[in-house]
Structures are given as structure tokens and as C-alpha cells.
């Protein structure tokens, strides 16, 4: 008995010692705005609390700065990478997202996000949360005296945050708000989609070509999602001409990693021309100059560019398939466009601009998307 007491005493001391030496878990705190919404059980939080994933009939909300949101919408509406009957990787001249409804929330009021990220990151996080609640139900911020803010829309089943900055400044807070209500928000971001696409492709070393303001978004996501992959964020400044800028990016990467090699470059841009970039890559392969030879040694034989539109399109298809969220309706994808504007309370609300927008834009050309198996 004495021996047993001695053993128990030693064990207790060891447990106490271990507890004293444990490093407390680092918990990221959400913004006051989320706590404010959670305290209001009659308003926005009630909408979130009663939220379901909206099932197969919900919409796919694409949220972001106008240019990125529209570019991504174009790719999603025209994507044709699989056979719609059996899911084989074979275009069948039918939209892959047939029957789906896309709500494109063009956040003109708060753009450019890079300004908010630099001056007030918490403000950008608040913008992301407010837009997500709008995607759940736009009446959350309606004003009885302002008819523009009283529109109704389909409840979102998936949230696509079409800006890399929202991965760092917003996604966590949107997810936290829904978790506080005991609900799940299905959220996609270009940062995570591109990193996971690189991992799926077997990349071991990649460069992320992104603005300095987006550095932490990629670095933090890489630590979570691709810890075994070497990820280097490279920012360039210049006159904006794409092909020389690509060479500048390679030069900076070479200075950072003198013996490094690249399986891919992730493009933090919805408008960069893959045609121009691939043409410059082929020019480098010809090794006409010493610089060409130096850069060619960096690029591995299977080097590729990974851009957000293709990565998000593939990620969305896989997600809908894995979670069985496809509508399975036999119809072309439906799309509605919304633009944020200031209401009478001095806050931003969505205003539908589908008619005006669709009449001024032609049907998008089919976009390339990566393999989805």
C-alpha cells in the first residue's frame, strides 16, 4: 500500500510538472464586430443561427473586388472539364456547374482591399463578415426607408472569397461567427486553393508571386496546409509589363534562394495572361542569354503556373462533388450580379445590377481548369 501511494505521488508530481511546462495553445481572437453580432440574437446572428448549408438548392456566393469576382464568375460559368454524366475528365460541351446559381457580390464600396489591409486590417475583416452575412440573407442589413436594401436572394451554400487578403483578414472571422452559432460555413479562398493545387500536383518548391501585403496570408496558410512544401513569397515593383516583371520575380527568387528550384509559380492575380507568361518561359528555355541560362536552371522540367481562377474552379467542383451539394438540375448555370453601395445609414448594402451588367458583357470564353481527380 505504501509503495502504491509512493507511485501515485510521483505520478501526480510528474503530471503537475508537465502541466507547468506546457506551452499554452495560441488562440487567435476574433474581431469585436463578430462578438457584437453574436450578442444580437434578434438580428444578423439569428440569421446565422438558423442557417443550414442551404442544401443543394443554395447559391454559390462569389465575394470580392469587382474585377476578381467577375473574372472568377466568367470561369465558373463556362467551365467544362468533366463529363456531367459519369464525372470522367472529359469535356462534354455542357457546363460543369449546370443547374447551379451563382451570386456575384462585387464589393465596389470597399475596394481596393489592399488599402484597407494596409490602414486597418480589422476593418477588412469586418467587411468580409458583413459580406458573408449578406450572402446568407441580404435582409440582415435592410433599411425600411431605403428600397435598394430590401432585395431578397437565395441563401448561399458555399462562400468563395475571391481575394487573397481575405484568407488572412476575414475567413477566420466568418468561420468563427458561424461556429459561435453552432453552424458550418463552407469557405474557399484563392490562397488555399492554389497551395492545395500545388500539393496535389506533387510540387516540392514553389514561389508565390504576390503583393507584399499578401505575404502573411500565403505564409500562414502554407504552414497549415503544405508544411512539407518550400514556399517563398516574392513581391515585385515595376512598370507592370508582365514578361519583364516575371524575369524580375525570378531574379528576386534567385537572390533569396541561390540554389533553389521551382516546380511552380503561384500567381496572385486574376488577370495575368498565362499565354504571355508561358511565352516568356519558352523564351528562357531557349537560353539565348546568360540570364536565360541562369533562370532556366531554376525552372524544373515539369514547371507550371498556377493561377487562382483555375485553382478555385477545380476546388469548387471537387467540394460540391465530395459533399454532394450539386443541384443535379438540367439547366445552364444561373448568375445574378450585386454591387455594394452606401445606404441611408452610411453602411454598404448589396444592390442587384444583373440586368445592367449582363446587357453590357458578352458570354465568356471557356477557361482552362486543372484536373480534379
Features from the language model and the residues they span:
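Sec-dependent signal peptide recognition
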Residues: 3-12
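Non-catalytic structural scaffold of enzyme domains
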Residues: 21-373
Amino acid at each position: 500500500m505504501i509503495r502504491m501511494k509512493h507511485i501515485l505521488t510521483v505520478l501526480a508530481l510528474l503530471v503537475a510538472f508537465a502541466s507547468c511546462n506546457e506551452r499554452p495553445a495560441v488562440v487567435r481572437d476574433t474581431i469585436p464586430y463578430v462578438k457584437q453580432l453574436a450578442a444580437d440574437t434578434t438580428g444578423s446572428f439569428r440569421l446565422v443561427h438558423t442557417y443550414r448549408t442551404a442544401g443543394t438548392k443554395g447559391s454559390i456566393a462569389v465575394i470580392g473586388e469587382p474585377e476578381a469576382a467577375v473574372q472568377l464568375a466568367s470561369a465558373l460559368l463556362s467551365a467544362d472539364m468533366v463529363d456531367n454524366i459519369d464525372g470522367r475528365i472529359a469535356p462534354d460541351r455542357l457546363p460543369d456547374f449546370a443547374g447551379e446559381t451563382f451570386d456575384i457580390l462585387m464589393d465596389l464600396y470597399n475596394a481596393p482591399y489592399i488599402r484597407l489591409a494596409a490602414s486597418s486590417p480589422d476593418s477588412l475583416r469586418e467587411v468580409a463578415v458583413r459580406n458573408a452575412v449578406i450572402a446568407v440573407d441580404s435582409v440582415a442589413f435592410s433599411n425600411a426607408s431605403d428600397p435598394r436594401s430590401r432585395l431578397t436572394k437565395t441563401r448561399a451554400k458555399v462562400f468563395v472569397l475571391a481575394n487573397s487578403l481575405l484568407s488572412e483578414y476575414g475567413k477566420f472571422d466568418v468561420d468563427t461567427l458561424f461556429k459561435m452559432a453552432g453552424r458550418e460555413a463552407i469557405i474557399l479562398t484563392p490562397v488555399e486553393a492554389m497551395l492545395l493545387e500545388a500539393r496535389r500536383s506533387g510540387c516540392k518548391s514553389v514561389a508565390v508571386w504576390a503583393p507584399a501585403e499578401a505575404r502573411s496570408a500565403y505564409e500562414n496558410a502554407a504552414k497549415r496546409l503544405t508544411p512539407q512544401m518550400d514556399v517563398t513569397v516574392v513581391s515585385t515593383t515595376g512598370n507592370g509589363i508582365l514578361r519583364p516583371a516575371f524575369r524580375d520575380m525570378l531574379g528576386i527568387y534567385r537572390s533569396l534562394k541561390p540554389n533553389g528550384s521551382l516546380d511552380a509559380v503561384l500567381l496572385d492575380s486574376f488577370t495575368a495572361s498565362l499565354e504571355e507568361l508561358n511565352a516568356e518561359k519558352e523564351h528562357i528555355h531557349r537560353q539565348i542569354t546568360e540570364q536565360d541560362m541562369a533562370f532556366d536552371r531554376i525552372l524544373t522540367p515539369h514547371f507550371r503556373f498556377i493561377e487562382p481562377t483555375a485553382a478555385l474552379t477545380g476546388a469548387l467542383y471537387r467540394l460540391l462533388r465530395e459533399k454532394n451539394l450539386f443541384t443535379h438540375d438540367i439547366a445552364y448555370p444561373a448568375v445574378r450580379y450585386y454591387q455594394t453601395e452606401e445606404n441611408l445609414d452610411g453602411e454598404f448594402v448589396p444592390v442587384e445590377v444583373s440586368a445592367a451588367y449582363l446587357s453590357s458583357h458578352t458570354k465568356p470564353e471557356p477557361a482552362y481548369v486543372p484536373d480534379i481527380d
